[in-house]
């Protein structure tokens, strides 16, 4: 039986959107405030962190089986913001693109059984539909640049 992986098409579309956006961002754009102390670069670094966390968890789940991975989201986001203070804005933007690509490729390589196991958990620590998170923040960035 084939499982529904239609989310991968949406992941690809939002990933392409991210790549195009990052390619046209200027250094002043990356420093533009989005409110709540976040800049465009901070939002992109935030995406990179959550994508790389998903990759680490997929690797773990493939070795050990799918399980919970509780996290204090506010503390994680505050930590990402603090890390951004020491990272060049352009590097954060480029990391976001690489992390999205890594997450998408990792998801595409997951065996169907693991995809089903992750999607079946009500407490899944991340979504395979990465496009949802990307879209939310790319929309914020594009609004902030207007």
For each feature predicted by the language model, list its residue ranges:
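Acidic-glycine-rich active-site phosphate/pyrophosphate-binding loop
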Residues: 19-20, 109, 113
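A generic helix-loop boundary/linker signal
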Residues: 1, 8, 33, 86, ...
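Hydrophobic residues in alpha-helical segments
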Residues: 22, 61-62, 107-108
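Alpha-helical transition-metal enzyme core signature, strongest for iron centers
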Residues: 11-18, 40-55, 81-89, 93-103, ...
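Short, contiguous alpha-helical
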Residues: 27-75, 112-146
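Long, hydrophobic N-terminal alpha-helical segment
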Residues: 1-36
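Short, helix-capping/interhelical loops that line the mouth of catalytic, cofactor-
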Residues: 1-6, 52-102, 146
